[in-house]
Regions:
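Feature responds to low-complexity, polar/acidic, surface-exposed segments characteristic
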Residues: 16, 23-93, 102-122, 129-153, ...
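BZIP DNA-binding basic region
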Residues: 2-13
Length: 216
């Protein structure tokens, strides 16, 4: 299936299910849908993406930096910051500096970002909430987030259907998020919700360590 055919098929599906794709601009033509499709992850040099591994705070800032519209990124681009642990020559400096300037990511303090540390589920949910500030969904909560600093962020993105908790009713906000969980959450933010393999475009990037039979 060509990208054009895929866009046309997705466009018709989105019109038929507008409640699910409520954040998309459904007045657009199929050819324009591609403008809202971003390649935001890159595998490792060995060709794997390590879905069950952790994602660092620097990697997270870079992913959301790539998701910015070009005009937003270009108009707010920063190459310096106040973090002592993110020097100008750090590989993710521009992403961290820009996303901090936009208020989407935050450091542990004004002078420390801890870029190589893995990111927690609460921190990731908060970034998703700051990245898309549109209308909220239904109220939803979990048994272990009352009084947590990210409670309102978590409740909002859960109500929008972007994040899921665990079967025991917990969210485990301070647990680290896996790469697969993070990408699943981002895809929900972007309304990339393929229901079957035929919904996926031909020629899409794949990784040998991602089992197509698994939920992610």
């Amino acid at each position: 299936m060509s990208v054009t055919d895929y866009n046309a098929r997705l466009y018709e599906k989105m019109k038929a299910e507008q409640d699910k794709y409520r954040d998309w601009l459904l007045h657009q033509e199929p050819s324009e849908i591609l403008n809202h499709t971003y390649e935001y992850i890159v595998g490792h040099n060995d060709g794997n993406v390590y879905p069950n591994g952790l994602i660092s705070r620097a990697e997270t800032a870079t992913v959301f930096f790539r998701l910015l519209k070009d005009e937003v990124r270009d108009g707010n681009l920063l190459t310096s910051n106040t973090y002592s642990d993110v020097p100008d020559d750090y590989w993710a400096n521009t992403a961290i500096s820009t996303m901090t300037g936009l208020g989407i990511v935050q450091g542990h303090s004004g002078t420390a970002f801890d870029p190589e540390a893995p990111i927690t589920r609460a921190q990731f949910a908060a970034i998703c909430a700051r990245f898309d500030t549109g209308a909220g969904g239904t109220t939803q909560t979990f048994s272990d987030i009352s009084g947590h600093w990210a409670e309102e962020y978590i409740r909002r993105v859960a109500g929008l259907g972007w994040i899921k908790g665990f079967e025991d009713g917990t969210f485990r906000p301070d647990a680290y998020i896996t790469r697969a969980q993070a990408m699943t959450m981002i895809n929900r933010v972007l309304n990339r919700i393929p229901e079957e393999n035929s919904d996926l475009p031909a020629g899409m990037n794949t990784w040998p360590d991602c089992n197509p039979c698994l939920l992610y």
